Amino acid sequence: MTTQPDSMSAIDFLIFMEHPVSLSSIADEYYTIVPRQEVKALSSSNQTMNEEQEHSCMRIIRFLHCRVKLSGNRNVLNANYVDGYEHKRKYIYTKSPCANNVDEYLQMMWDKNVEIIVVPSRSENDVNFHQYWSPNEGAVIEYDNFKIETLEVTTKPQYILTLLILTNRKGRIHRISHFEYTAWPVYSICHDLRAFLDFVSNINEQYTYLEKHKPSRQTRSYNCAFASMVTIAQQYFVYLIPVLQNSKRRE
């Protein structure tokens, strides 16, 4: 006889997170999903491959099993598929590009049909960060294989939503919604979770809108890529959002 886990509403979750041991409890639950030895092996492999790229910020835990490949079977550095709550390989976790690999980054967004990019936090001290799009509406930046136009910028108290148009050499276009969370403290996990939940909720609304308005014949491989360095706490919250939504639907 299997025991069904207790459901938790979003409000109950926020109350739970106020408890001092809540984060360790979430970590314990995470390790019941992903074996510790797998995390250790993946972290060790990642350290060997990217040791020169690691800074003082927390390393991304590789949830899952394989790296992203472009056409020609080329691996994309710092890009891994990640399972969602109900779907395999629902997300791509990656780093924002450096100045010398923007084309490779944009090629991944194009090849994998990514329509939403999420930047949960940006380290102001990361010297390798390169803003590959313009903050000004109507501006266009050209690269070797792509040009990217900033169509619209919407600034909210906790995040910035930028609508981008990616154009390849053949003149074909691809639209991307770029969400950047601006309220997360760079060196602390102490934060108002309601603001972060609101951020994720707005991403989900955009996802629902895209699903509703996609052409009937269009297939979509990957809707969302998480860019930049994602903290462990943020990974837990993003993973738990659909869990909470699913439990709410059952209430």
Swiss-Prot record:
Name of the protein in its database record: Tyrosine phosphatase-like protein J3
Tyrosine-protein phosphatase domain mapped to chain residues: 26-251
InterPro entries hit by this protein: Prot-tyrosine_phosphatase-like, Protein-Tyr_Phosphatase, PTP_cat
Do you know which SUPFAM superfamilies this protein is assigned to? (Phosphotyrosine protein) phosphatases II (SSF52799)
Read off the CDD domains from this record: PTPc
The gene name on file is: J4
Q: Which family does it belong to?
A: Belongs to the protein-tyrosine phosphatase family.
Q: Which SMART domains match?
A: PTPc
Any one Gene Ontology molecular-function term assigned to this protein's record: protein tyrosine phosphatase activity
Q: Which domain of life is it from?
A: Viruses
